[in-house]
Amino acid sequence: MIVCRTRKDAELAFEHLKRIMTKLKLTLNPQKTKIVDMNKESFDFLGFRYQKFGKTKCGRKLPYMMPSKKAMKKVKDAIRVITCRKSAYEGLEQKVEKLNPLIRGWRNYFQHGNSTRRFKQLDEYVWMRLWRRVYYRRKQKKYREHVLYGFRKWYATSGIEYFYYLNKKRYVAVF
């Protein structure tokens, strides 16, 4: 990725890059190589979506770098596989042990962008997947409220890592 102020500068840099690549006997993939005006459109690169929106006091748009939709779908699919019903023989502790390395790696890679909103979404998704597994094991409705109480307590002390709450203690109110 090469960042330039004007389209003319970008085209000059692109031509210079082509010359360097031909000297090295390498080629650029025309489908993946393009010049983009970030004020008008966004683009994905290495799992991040680069986009400008919002405004400063001067009226300029701010650049943002967040996990792409494809990356979000991929991590949700991985979470879904770990927490699926087919692995019902596993306890929640085993699921947490499998989820923690996934969460830690994903968080460490994407923490350098503007990922707060996406991290919160993923924390809610993990909670919902684990809660759903516990909730639907109880068929009788009168027990479900008690199960929720116990699950909140368990989740708060389970040792599961969070996407958003990095190196922070998270307090969960138990009702």
Language-model regions, residue ranges each:
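Non-catalytic terminal/accessory segments
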Residues: M1-F175
